[in-house]
Amino acid sequence: MSETDGQVGKVEVVSASTGQMGQRYLAAGSRVAMRLWDEQPESEGKPEAAREYETVGYVVSGRARLRAEDQALDLGPGDSWLVPAGVRHTYEILEAFTAVEATSPPAGEAGRDAPPA
C-alpha cells in the first residue's frame, strides 16, 4: 500500500510482504514506512551498517542491544529508539524480539533495505 494515489489504506499483517531480513512491510506512504520485526530469534549482531534512512522504533516484547558507533543501548518492552540516517549500527537480539519501526524515507523502496554486505 502506498500513499502515492492519494487514498487511505490498510495493510493486514497476515498479508504483509516479508523482506530478506525477516521484516514484515506494513503501511507505507511516499515519505515514511512501517515494518514489523516479529519474534526475531536470539542472534549476535551483524556487522555495523549505515542506512540512507532514519529509523524510529518501539519494542513490543523481548530484548535487544542496539550498537551504534560508540554507543550501546539495551532495549526492552516499552522502549523506543532513534537511529539517524547515515549512522553505522547493528542489533544483537538477546531474547525473542518483536518491534515496530518507522523509516523515512521508506526503507523498502529503491533497494534501501537490502541486508548489509
Where are these regions (language model features)?
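Short strand-coil-strand connectors
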Residues: S30, R67-Q71, L94
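Short, charged, intrinsically disordered terminal tails
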Residues: G108-A117
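Short acidic-glycine-tyrosine-enriched beta hairpin
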Residues: D70-A85
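Surface-exposed loop/turn positions
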Residues: S30, S43, D79, V87, ...
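Ligand-binding loop in jelly-roll beta-barrel domains
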Residues: A85-E109
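A short, N-terminal "cap"/entry segment at the start of jelly-roll beta-barrel domains
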Residues: M1-L36, Q40, K46-P47, P116-A117
